[in-house]
């Protein structure tokens, strides 16, 4: 039994910057200014006190979802951290402290991506600190679950992620050796272009690390995105399953503070129309529906087996 508010768009200018994150070989990302910090937030309340609103049309204990929206918007001005997960934890804690009859709250959000825009400077072009482009690129994701236990609040569940990574590798991918029977019409490919859409999610051994209070232990979505594209560049994979497994191993290797990593992938590979051109040139077209997908979960035991 739960209810809540979703698609709460909130924007904060000049939030505190994310600084001091640990750098990795696959990424140049070392922090962000957070001059423009935007989230689409979802709030979910749980509690037995809400049962009469369902069974008896008694709204005595109901916090209107419009009030939830206003609460989130107000707290965006109070939050002093630098991460989506930290904001969600902050707001969730404030909800539980404000409404003692709420037993648990799930807070989730997708971060709106904004790109810095180059403007002329003294020595060429520099990123503007005033103008940003609203981007259609991948987005960071966060979810936290807080519950009441007596007089204490427990925080033991979280998920972080980066969604809608879209990558195309023009060659050095294959797909061979799969089941061949009377239903098979797909030809094997020793070398093909590969187009994938990828969502990556991860959990920490200690959920507190997700909040960003200790930046060295925080895993930025930008770095995980960069790991995915670097591994895609390096690996000649024989399937998307093989590719996401290699990405997962690299993520777990780079971040010993993580407990697990999960994938949802979609195959959007273009179909070859002509391969009789010079060199590696090909003509391709959009694939027809339906499309293939893959889901996979890994934890530290997978890394230890390597």
Swiss-Prot record:
Catalytic residues of the enzyme: 5 (charge relay system), 65 (charge relay system)
Residues bound to urate: 65-66, 175, 192, 240-241, 267
Entry coiled-coil feature ranges: none
Reaction(s) the record says it catalyses: urate + O2 + H2O = 5-hydroxyisourate + H2O2
EC number(s) given by UniProt: 1.7.3.3
Annotated region (Disordered), positions in chain: 281-306
GO biological process: purine nucleobase catabolic process; urate catabolic process
Pfam family, one: Uricase
Keywords, comma-separated and alphabetical: Oxidoreductase, Plasmid, Purine metabolism
Entry's Gene Ontology molecular function annotations: urate oxidase activity
Superkingdom, taxonomy of origin: Archaea
Disulfide bonds: none
Metabolic or biological pathway: Purine metabolism; urate degradation; (S)-allantoin from urate: step 1/3
Function: Catalyzes the oxidation of uric acid to 5-hydroxyisourate, which is further processed to form (S)-allantoin.
Family (UniProt): Belongs to the uricase family.
Protein name per Swiss-Prot or TrEMBL: Uricase
């Amino acid at each position: 039994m739960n209810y809540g508010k979703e698609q709460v768009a909130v924007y904060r200018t000049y939030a505190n910057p994310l600084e001091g994150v640990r750098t990795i070989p696959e990424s140049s990302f070392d922090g962000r200014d957070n001059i423009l910090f935007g989230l689409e937030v979802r709030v979910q309340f749980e509690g037995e006190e809400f049962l009469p609103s369902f069974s008896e049309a008694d709204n005595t204990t109901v916090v209107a979802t419009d009030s939830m929206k206003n609460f989130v918007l107000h707290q965006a001005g109070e939050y002093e951290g630098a991460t989506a997960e930290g904001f969600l934890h902050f707001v969730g804690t404030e909800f539980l402290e404000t409404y003692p009859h709420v037993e648990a709250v799930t807070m989730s959000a997708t971060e709106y991506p904004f790109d810095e825009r180059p403007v002329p400077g003294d020595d060429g072009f520099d990123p503007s600190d005033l103008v940003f482009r609203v981007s259609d690129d991948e987005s960071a994701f966060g979810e936290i679950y807080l519950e009441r236990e007596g007089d204490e609040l427990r925080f033991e569940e979280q998920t972080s992620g980066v969604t809608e990574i879209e990558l195309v590798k023009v060659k050095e991918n294959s797909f061979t050796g799969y089941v061949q029977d009377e239903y098979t019409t797909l030809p094997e490919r020793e070398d093909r272009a590969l187009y994938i859409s990828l969502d990556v999610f991860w959990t920490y051994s200690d959920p507190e690390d997700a909040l960003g209070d200790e930046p060295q232990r925080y895993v930025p979505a930008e770095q995980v995105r960069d790991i995915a594209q670097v591994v895609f560049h390096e690996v000649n994979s024989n399937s998307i399953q093989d590719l996401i497994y290699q990405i997962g191993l690299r993520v777990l290797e780079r971040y010993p503070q993580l407990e697990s990593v999960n994938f949802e992938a979609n195959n959007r590979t273009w179909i070859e129309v002509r391969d009789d051109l010079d060199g590696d040139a090909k003509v391709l077209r959009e694939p027809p529906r339906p499309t293939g997908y893959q889901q996979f979960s890994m934890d530290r035991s997978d890394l230890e087996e390597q």
